[in-house]
Amino acid sequence: MTWETARRAIDLAATGKMPFTLQFSGGEPLLALPLLRQMADYVRSNRIPARMDLQTNGTLLTEETATFLRSARIGIGVSLDGRPAVHDALRCYPDGRGTAADVVAGIRQLAQCGMEIGLTTVVTADNVAELSGVVEMAYYLGNVRRVGFDLLRPQGRGSAVRRARAEDMAQAMEAVFALNRKLGRMIGHSMAITQMEQAACLAQRTGSGFSHCHAMNGAGVHVDALGNIYACSSFVGDAHFLLGNVERGIDVQRRKEVALEMQNAMAFCRTCADFSACGGACYARRAGQGPPAVSAAECALKRAAMKALLNVAVQCNKRTGQ
C-alpha cells in the first residue's frame, strides 16, 4: 500500500467525524513498518479520533518496533495457535522452521515495553484438541490480557485446511473455560476470553440482529493494498463484494445491498432459540460452503461461551445470596 492510498483511507473513515477503529492486518502489517509510522503520525498530528489496533504473527517484534507501537498507542493482537510444538506444526518459515520461539521473543519485547496484548488462535482440526494450551501460554507470558478463538475461514489457503468439528469444539472450549477458572483462582484473576466477553455484551442488549458482524450491519469495511474497499477482509479480490475505492469513496447503496444479502443468506440463524444471545454466525465462514451445518462448530463455540457466562452468574448469585 502506498502512503497516498493509506492517507485517503484514513481521511475517508474520518469524514463522519466520529470515533472509529483503524485495524492494521494483512498479510503481515509489520512488513510495512515505515508506512505504519506515517499513518500513526498522521492520525496523531491531525487529531483524528481513531483507535489503532494491529494484528501480527509476532515474528517481527523487535525492541525498536515494540517501542514504536507503545509510543503510538497501537493495540496489539498476536497470533498463537497453541503451545510451541503445536504452533510450529501450523506456522512455519519458508525453510520449515517453526515460528513459536520468535513469537514468544516478540511478545517478551512488548512486555519489556509495558505493553499488554491479546492472543488470537485460529482453530482448525489440527489444533482444536490443544486449545487449553493457549490459555496456559497466556498465563505463562504474563502480559496477555485477552485470548480469542477464531474458527478457520475457508478462503484462500484456508480452503485446503481441515475444519474443526462441532463436538470437538464444544469439548475444547469446556476445557478452556475450566482451566481459565482454575488458573484464575490460583493467581487471583482470570484471563478475559473474547467469546465470553461478547456473550456478556449480547446478554445486555435489548434488540436483536446480526450484531457481531460489521459487514452485515454496514458499519465496517476493509481497504486492500490497492485502495479497493470490500465489505469484509475475507472477500478481497471478489468483485461481488467490492464497495468502492479510496478515491471515489463507498457506494452506499451497494453496501446496503451486500449487507442485506449476507443477512438473508444467514436467515437460518434467526430460527435458533439462541440467536439473540449469540448474534448469529459468520457469513464469510459459511459462504459457498453448503448447508447451515457448516456453522455447527461456531455454534458450539458460542454456546460454550454462553454456558460459561451463565455459570459465572450462578456463582456470583450464590456468593451474594440471591
Question: Across the structure, where does each feature detected by a protein language model lie?
Answer:
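Short acidic/His/Gly/Ser-rich catalytic and metal-binding motifs that mark active-site loops
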Residues: 84-88, 156-159, 281
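Radical SAM enzyme [4Fe-4S]-AdoMet core and its adjacent flexible, acidic
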Residues: 93-101, 108-212, 216
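C-terminal accessory region of radical SAM enzymes
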Residues: 168-203, 229, 233-279
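Radical SAM/AdoMet-radical enzyme domain recognition
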Residues: 3-25, 32-152
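Short, solvent-exposed loop/turn segments at secondary-structure junctions
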Residues: 29, 59-60, 83, 124-125, ...
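Radical SAM enzyme core and accessory elements
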Residues: 226-228, 241, 264-322
